[in-house]
A protein has these predicted regions:
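Long, well-ordered, tryptophan-enriched scaffold segments
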Residues: 30, 40, 46-78
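Helix-enriched interaction subdomains in cytosolic or periplasmic regions
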Residues: 58, 69-102
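Short, conserved alpha-helical segments within structured domains
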Residues: 63, 85, 115-117
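Structural preference for beta-strand elements that scaffold enzyme active sites
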Residues: 10-12, 32-33
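C-terminal non-catalytic regions of proteins with extracellular/luminal or membrane-system context
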Residues: 1, 5-8, 14-23, 43-55, ...
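A short alpha/beta connector and helix-capping loop motif
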Residues: 24-37
Length: 532
């Protein structure tokens, strides 16, 4: 299988919960462990397949060996004397939350907050943060921090309830009054667990109405309103133009509260980048027309155009692009260099770029490298992320960041080859701070070892055949005679060109209907082109 033979995987293959429909076929395809097991149905399926000869003992033994190797490796690495340091574990959780939070918006320098400013924290998530997923991903944490406990002296108002969506007038009015009396209002908002969890899909990108209503009401009386988000994925923000700052925490783990305060007050400089695009509305998403499918069939009509590959290729207006993330400092990109301008099969090219911290505080920048392919037969995204590196810089400091590209960096999966393929041509190497903020671009010429095999049929169009040198040599003169004949029939020379353009879209087998070629002649031409 590609998993083991091509990619070199040596571990165990485990199914998703309840994903097996035919245990014997699964083993033959490389499955090892079925989850959940124990009902006996899988065992009976295996025994029946062995007896019927549709599953070999060799295939079954391979799955058993993979399981035993895994058990053996776990046993060898067990450490009975290991001590779980809960404090160290929590400190790590805080650090992860601090480094992954994304500053989406920060107008007028509202953030970081000045120490001692009169701030108010609003929203139930300030006291009870949504910090982890639901369902089987849920864990029992030893320690969870909330923002309030790490911001002593800061006023608080609940503002909304997470167990319902309707506005609570008393809670909202108290929050709005507190916001109007403060210098800065920080609203902790997002999605309750009931909005997104294991086992079901989200049907909306909207937050609960009571939260959206609260943000709008607070922003109307407090120009310095900051929104801190707790959510598992992208959301709509109908209020985004009314607030100067938005900090995306996502589901930030045990240290969510402490990390939020450190980021808000500048003890830590935000450095996270979006790993997804935030569309403006649900109807903008690539799967909108085909989700959730019909009956038992899901149609993946978007193909490879998922996420930023879709939004950037269609130049869609998005809320926040893939890779976006601000900082309390600024970064300058310069001196993009490629170690070679032409690369062939088996060769690599090193791409280097210099990044400088041009601001007044230390910060981290995630440098992103995108590759834009030449136009070819296959529809490909306008650009794809092929590398990224996070670099830490003091004020005024510069560092050189290096990436290595090879054939795989330029390739796409070609169904006809059952493998990845990079077509010859000029590729753009783009470096920047997001998929929409590309600072520098270089050119790389790629020379494939072999052209992509092309197979023409009677259903191929004249335009397609004309892209092949042998096809153009044979079909070209035929096209010219047909166009000239059409021009002679009308008596207008200009009709030659228009007739030629029209004919490019017809199929080869139409030439038989036009009495231009016989079926035998067409088959001979196809054989000659395909064997060239």
């Amino acid at each position: 299988s590609p998993l083991r033979k091509r990619w070199g995987y040596e571990g165990m293959v485990v199914t998703d919960w309840g994903a097996v429909k035919d245990r014997a076929k699964g083993i033959a395809a490389g499955q090892d462990l079925e989850m959940p097991g124990g009902s006996g149905r899988g065992t009976n399926s295996i025994l029946s397949a062995i007896k019927a000869g549709t599953l070999s003992e060799e295939e079954l033994n391979a799955a058993v060996r993979n399981l035993l190797r895994f058990v053996d490796s776990v046993t060898k690495t067990e450490n009975a004397s290991a001590v779980f340091d809960r404090d160290a574990d929590y400190r790590m959780a805080v650090s992860v939350a601090e480094n992954s939070a994304v500053l989406l918006k920060n107008e007028k320098g509202v953030l970081p907050l000045a120490k001692g400013c009169k701030a108010v924290f609003l929203g139930e998530f300030a006291q009870h943060p949504r910090y982890q997923g639901g369902g089987s991903s849920h864990v029992n944490s030893a320690k969870v921090s909330c923002a309030l406990e790490h911001a002593p002296g800061v006023a608080y108002a609940q503002g909304y309830r997470t167990d319902e969506d309707t506005v609570d007038p008393a809670l909202e009015q108290a929050a709005v009054a507190a916001a109007a009396d403060a210098e800065v209002a920080v609203i902790f908002a997002g999605l309750p667990e009931r909005y997104e969890s294991e086992g079901y899909d989200r049907t909306t990108l909207a937050m609960p109405e009571n939260q959206n209503h609260l943000i709008a009401a607070v922003a109307a009386v407090q120009p310095n309103t900051v929104v801190v988000l707790h959510n598992g994925s992208a959301i709509e923000m109908p209020w985004v133009n009314d607030v100067p700052a938005v900090l995306e925490l996502y589901l930030a783990g045990d240290g969510a509260g402490e990390a939020a305060v450190n980021l808000l007050y500048g003890a830590v400089n935000p450095s996270g980048k979006l790993a997804e695009t935030f569309p403006r509305r649900l109807s903008d998403t690539p799967a909108y027309l085909s989700f959730p499918g019909e009956r038992e069939t899901s149609v993946y009509s978007e193909g490879v155009f998922v996420g930023y590959r879709y939004y950037d290729t269609t130049e869609a207006d998005v809320l926040f692009p893939f890779g976006h993330g601000l900082s309390y400092t600024t970064f300058e990109y310069s001196v993009l260099r490629l170690s070679r301008s032409t690369v062939r099969e088996g060769e690599e090219v090193q791409v280097t770029v210099t990044v400088k911290n041009t601001g007044a505080v230390a910060g981290k920048e995630t440098v992103q490298l995108y590759v834009a392919p030449p136009k070819g037969e296959r529809h490909r995204p306008v650009r794809e992320l092929k590398g990224f590196a996070k670099v830490s810089l003091q004020p005024g400091e510069s560092k050189e960041v290096q990436f290595t590209l090879d054939k795989r960096s330029l390739a796409y999966y070609e169904p006809e080859l059952h493998d990845f393929y990079a077509e010859s041509g000029t590729y753009q190497i783009c470096v920047g701070a997001s998929s929409r903020d590309l600072r520098l671009t270089g050119l790389l010429e790629w020379q494939a070892a072999q052209p992509l095999p092309v197979h023409f049929t009677a259903a191929s169009t004249l335009k397609q055949v004309m892209t092949h040198p042998v096809g153009a040599a044979i079909i070209g003169p035929i096209l010219q005679r047909m166009a000239a004949a059409a021009g002679s029939a009308t008596g207008k020379k200009d009709d030659d060109d228009s007739s030629l353009s029209m004919m490019m879209g017809i199929q080869l087998n139409t030439l038989i209907d036009f009495h231009v070629l016989t079926e035998e002649q067409l088959n001979g031409i196809l054989s000659q082109i395909n064997q060239a």
